[in-house]
Amino acid sequence: MKLKDTGLTFQDIKDKVNKYMIETYERFDFLAETADGMYIYDENGTPYLDFYAGIAVNSAGNCNPKVVAAVKDQVEDIMHTFNVSVQ
């Protein structure tokens, strides 16, 4: 979902994050709206090199087409389970 589709401003989102999330590190002052490969893009399309890539991004890149396809395939069958069942 894009920021423009929420009816919220970037400041609204920042205020909610600051209210409900523990601040363990300083956050970037932009809204990460999309990502592709090694870049994150803000709501204006400005690219930022993703030096803080998360666990999966470290090896696959943001929105890697093979990973996206595999996730879509999996969530069509089951999206969440717990460790008392084998899937």
Label every model-predicted segment.
Residues 1-36, 78:
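Active-site-adjacent loop/helix segments that line or gate small-molecule/cofactor pockets in enzymes
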Residues 20, 25, 41, 48-52, ...:
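Aromatic side chains
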Residues 47-87:
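Glycine-rich loop-to-alpha-helix module at the N-terminal edge of alpha/beta enzyme cores
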Residues 30-50:
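Active-site and channel-lining beta-strand-loop segments
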